[in-house]
């Protein structure tokens, strides 16, 4: 499939940086988008020049001036790139924390078989606008390989949310998931919860602002 060979990215040298004053102004607003980009398919993913440290791209670089972008040419060095690779002690606590999240997401690409090789099942078509879910602010899907399943939720909202995610009968049939009680572990936090999986049932989730949950569980056949 062509999607397995498409490079996914949120930032490049042509686009304004997520953290720039011209765009979101906050690198944490890019985290839920990165969760989706990294985990949705088997495709390669790119992290661009200090994105993992929250590079703002607000330097007045050469010919382009202050435009919220970071050049690919070697006449300029972004401050966060220099600190991140040559002087990590100079990184702020926030920059270090953001970097650890990006590192963890990239490790999941290689470590988790459901991400490397697994099937994808979109859950957005059954999770409509309601007091329990906002499709304009949350994005949900499943990944599965063998007996390993990931329930991925990205929250683009600026507030912590309590949501209910519907898993339709079609997902159980397509992925070969039996109805059963499972213990889910969030790969981002280590938090565990027990869920009774039912066709067309709901899973209650608590998700932080500009963040997500990557719940992993194993099924018994």
Give residue ranges: language-model regions.
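C-terminal beta-strand-rich structural cap/linker in extracellular carbohydrate-active enzymes
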Residues: 195-221
């Amino acid at each position: 499939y062509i999607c397995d060979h498409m490079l996914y990215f949120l930032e490049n040298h042509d686009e304004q940086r997520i953290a720039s004053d011209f765009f979101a102004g906050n690198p944490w607003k890019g985290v839920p988008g990165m969760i989706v980009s990294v985990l949705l398919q088997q495709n390669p993913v790119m992290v661009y020049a200090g994105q993992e440290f929250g590079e703002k791209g607000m330097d007045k670089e050469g010919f382009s001036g202050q435009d919220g972008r970071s050049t690919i040419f070697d006449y300029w060095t972004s401050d966060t790139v220099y600190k991140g690779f040559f002087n990590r002690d100079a990184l702020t606590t926030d920059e270090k924390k953001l970097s650890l999240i990006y590192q963890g997401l990239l490790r999941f690409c290689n470590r988790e078989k459901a991400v490397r090789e697994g099937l994808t099942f979109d859950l957005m078509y059954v999770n409509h606008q309601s007091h329990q879910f906002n499709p304009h602010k949350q994005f949900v899907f499943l990944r599965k390989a063998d007996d390993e399943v990931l329930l991925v939720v990205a929250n683009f909202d600026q507030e912590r949310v309590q949501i209910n995610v519907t898993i339709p009968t079609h997902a159980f049939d397509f992925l070969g998931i039996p109805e059963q009680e499972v213990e889910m572990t969030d790969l981002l936090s280590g938090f565990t919860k027990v869920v009774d999986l039912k066709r067309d049932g709901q899973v209650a989730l608590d998700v932080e602002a500009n963040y997500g949950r990557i719940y992993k569980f194993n099924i018994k056949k």
